[in-house]
Design a protein with these regions (language model features):
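A hydrophobic/aromatic-rich effector-binding and dimerization subdomain
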Residues: 1-22, 68-139, 157-166
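Short, conserved beta-strand element in jelly-roll/cupin
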Residues: 32-49, 65
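Structural motif
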Residues: 46-48, 55, 71, 93
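Terminal helix-turn-helix DNA-binding modules in bacterial transcription factors
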Residues: 184, 188, 193-198, 205, ...
């Protein structure tokens, strides 16, 4: 049996954690995933981002929604300066902020279900200034900073969801279309029994060619991807007390 290959990166002990980074190293980073949600917003410079096989070219103000368990990596050329903010978010904390029909975790769910991960901060949206205000509160600290940061975080997530609901998405700039289609199919059928032969027949491709292209594009095998995704889904389902059948 092939060992699990995806790397779990980062950790989160707080309800949310914000980073403000700027560099031009262009370090190559393999596909990886987190057990928490993540938002990346590009503030300046040039950068690309890949999520579940889709590659995007980012412009300043664009933000990337990376839900828990989604494989992703930055795509940055050596010497290309880019400044960004990265927000780690605990899924349970985000769901607990739900009021009525306003669930702030909806944006991540929609991104994963529609396979649309990048959105543009335009049309009067204040996502970028809200990120900056939250960063300033965290940086300054002082009396009431934690409470103020919670309020600013909530406001930011409401605005992010408004942008997503408004459909201000950024189209993918690249990726192997066959592999992307396969990734999307796998994510929609994680609870179904799947075999390599059945997948190859569905996508009209030899199984050996399919497995080779999948590994070339993602760095991982179809089996390794499925196994890890199913384990992540099982943890999520068990954590929510569901009795959904898992394979």
């Amino acid at each position: 049996m092939e060992p699990l290959q995806y790397e779990v990166r980062g950790y989160l002990k707080e309800p949310f954690r914000l980073f403000h980074l700027a560099d031009g190293r262009g370090e190559y980073i393999e596909y990886h995933y987190h057990t928490f949600h993540k938002i990346i917003i590009l503030l300046a410079g040039r950068a690309g981002y890949a999520v579940e096989g889709e590659r995007y070219e980012l412009a300043p103000g664009d933000f990337v929604l990376v839900g828990s368990g989604s494989i992703h990596r930055p795509v940055v050329e050596t010497g290309d300066y880019y400044e960004r903010m990265i927000l780690y978010i605990a899924p349970d904390y985000l769901r607990a902020l739900t009021v009525g029909d306003c669930d702030p975790s909806e944006c991540f769910r929609q991104a994963q279900e529609t396979f649309q991960y990048v959105y543009r901060d335009e049309g009067g949206s204040c996502v970028r200034p809200l990120f900056q205000a939250l960063a300033e509160t965290v940086r300054q600290g002082g009396y009431g900073a934690a409470l103020l940061a919670q309020a600013q975080f909530t406001e930011l997530m409401v605005e992010v969801n408004r942008v997503v609901r408004g459909g201000h998405r950024v189209g993918a700039a690249g990726g192997d279309s066959k592999v992307v289609s396969l990734l999307q199919y796998l994510n929609l059928h994680l609870a179904d029994p799947l075999t390599i032969d059945e997948l190859a027949a569905r996508f009209y491709i030899s199984k050996y060619h399919m497995m080779r292209r999948f590994r070339q594009e993602t760095g991982y095998s179809v089996h390794g991807y499925l196994t890890e995704k199913r384990l992540l889904l099982a943890r999520q389902v068990l954590g929510q007390g569901s009795t959904r059948l898992l394979y």
